[in-house]
Regions:
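Extended, highly charged clamp/arch subdomains and adjacent linkers
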Residues: 1-91, 107-112, 126, 133-143
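Structured alpha-helical segments in the cores of large, soluble enzyme domains
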Residues: 4-10, 37-49, 141-155, 174-185, ...
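Signature of lipid phosphatidyltransferase scaffolds
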Residues: 6-12, 18-22, 235-310, 396-402, ...
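Generic beta-strand/beta-sheet core signal
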Residues: 23, 61-63, 139-141, 165-169, ...
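Active-site cores of enzymes that catalyze phosphoryl transfer or operate on phosphate-rich substrates
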Residues: 82-163, 242-310
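Primarily the HKD phosphodiesterase
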Residues: 157-216, 309-373
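Phosphate/diphosphate-binding loops
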Residues: 197-262, 374-395
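Conserved small/polar residues in nucleotide/adenosyl-binding loops
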Residues: 478-487
């Protein structure tokens, strides 16, 4: 358009051209529309997505050399202050870069492909028998997500399986998990999908998946108006000789095969009855538009997650130097939690924080946070697990779940955490933190002033993510030997 502008305007002289890219607010809220209303949430979301295209501009990028007059005109037309207009010589829209890898020889420019380890202990047709005896931890992307997908297909074909219930937040394109759920519904299983339509920038994808799953016969629920459903929870209910058995999956990341190759996440698969009962209660309450209060095993936000977390921090604080708190999350800004961690440090309790992104708690401040350390791993994969560890030795407790320590997670979302009690699974979670602690190549250590530095005295190179590939490949075969021994 810019190139042919003189032709477009006939006899007029074009003095100046520029490419302007406008970024608009993505903040759409259904709360005001839905409160006290029985409107169809999917239809409401579709209207809101159309409205998003007309929301107020928050930024403009101008590509090329432009005059002050042109800049002023762009700001006036868009209603933007000077600080929100950016002039760049680079292309304003870089999305074309994603198509470039297929056009060039990138030999030597990319990381070597490392396929995820297959858990050889699991054989198709044997999943329920295995899980009846063992908990299983899947560590992504070091191990494949395929066992979970296979479990859904096995549930679909098992005549004793009554239902599959799952929370869905961000699905991959051409999702095999969505296909497995549709297959189960088409083969007579009751499949209930609690699909969060408000997953930012995945709204349209989730609307499309809701229609596909509904057409296959799945029951589609859209969660609660006041709380986003962010928990990663799947429940398979099956008839067993003694009655009903629950097989539950609690995870830290989305049911997304694409991010399973790029994000570090954990999935716990268990037949623990208490976890199953809590999961069943959770799906029942959410189906009625209610949150979950008292539970046996799971920590569930917004009611139970933060109080349980604070109680465990307080218990370690009372132990002073004998206590230990280890936390791995993506981000932290919850003021109450941070204040409690400061108290723990003041009592002499060791507090290790592994926070990949924003952390509003500064470590190493004399008299306040000198027993707190903050470490971030920035490597090939995006660190995404949420892990809590309390105590030392045999009394040590380990938890994994879906929520960060942002106030939106502790107060305004549905999240779920579970204890990891199986000795093998527990050891594997602890090894993740141990590897991050030893990393001296991709680690960044927060300083008291909020800056980050590489570890001092690095010594022999150790990359946690590379090590964990090797570790979890070996773990798969360890599980096989243990399973064969018990048989």
């Amino acid at each position: 358009v810019a190139h042919f502008a003189p032709l477009l305007f006939g006899e007029r002289r074009v003095r100046e051209t520029a490419i302007v890219r406008v970024t608009r607010s993505a903040d759409i809220s259904v709360r005001d529309i839905m409160d006290g209303c029985d409107a169809d949430l999917r239809a409401v979301m579709e209207r809101l997505l159309r409205r998003r295209r007309r929301l107020e501009p928050v930024r403009a990028q101008v590509q090329g050399r432009v005059s002050d007059e042109m800049r002023a005109l762009a700001r006036e037309l868009l209603g933007l202050p000077k600080r929100q207009l950016f002039v760049t010589s680079a292309p304003a829209d870089l999305s074309f870069v994603l198509t470039m890898p297929g056009e060039f020889d990138l030999t030597g420019l990319t990381c070597p492909e490392i396929p995820p380890a297959k858990n050889v202990a699991l054989q198709k047709g044997d999943y329920f028998a295995y899980l009846a005896q063992h908990d299983l931890l899947l560590a992504l992307p070091y191990q494949s997500i395929n066992p979970f997908v296979d479990l859904l297909y096995e549930a679909a074909d098992d005549p004793d399986v009554v239902s599959i219930k799952i929370t869905l937040y961000r699905l991959a394109g051409s999702s095999r998990i969505a296909a497995a759920l549709a297959y189960a519904a088409e083969h007579g299983k009751q499949v209930q999908c609690l699909l969060e339509l408000r997953a930012r920038f995945d709204e349209q994808s989730n609307i499309d998946y809701s229609r596909m799953l509904e057409d296959a016969g799945c029951d589609i629920l859209y969660g609660l108006t006041k709380y986003k459903v962010h928990t990663k929870l799947c429940l398979i209910t099956r008839r067993c000789p003694g009655g009903i058995c629950y097989y539950t999956q609690v995870g830290t990341g989305n049911y997304n095969e694409k991010t399973a190759e790029q994000y570090t996440d954990l999935m716990l698969l268990t037949s623990d009855p208490a976890i199953g009962r809590d999961a069943a209660k959770t799906f029942d309450r959410l189906a009625r538009g209610e949150t979950v209060g008292e539970t046996e095993a799971l920590w569930l936000a917004p009611e139970g997650y933060k109080p349980q977390l604070m109680a465990h921090i307080e218990a370690q604080t009372r132990l002073g130097p004998e206590g230990y708190i280890g936390i791995k999350v993506n981000s932290m800004n919850d003021a109450d939690v941070m204040a409690r961690l400061v108290r723990a440090s003041e009592a002499g309790t060791e507090v290790e924080l592994f926070v990949r992104g924003i952390c509003c708690l500064r470590p190493g401040v004399p008299g306040r946070t000198e027993h707190i350390s903050v470490r971030s791993i920035i490597g090939r994969y995006l660190e995404h697990e949420r892990i809590f560890v309390f105590g030392r030795g045999e009394a040590q407790e380990v938890f994994i779940g879906s929520g960060d320590l942002l106030e939106r997670n502790t107060m305004r979302r549905i999240e779920a955490f579970t204890a990891v009690t199986d000795p093998n699974a527990r050891a594997e979670v602890l090894e993740v933190l141990s590897a991050m602690r030893r990393d001296n190549r991709q680690a960044w250590i927060m300083q008291p002033d909020g800056s980050y530095l590489r570890p001092e005295g690095a010594g022999e190179p150790f990359v946690s993510q590379a090590y964990l590939h090797t570790y979890f490949a070996a773990v798969s075969y360890t599980h096989l030997r243990a399973h064969e021994t018990r048989h």
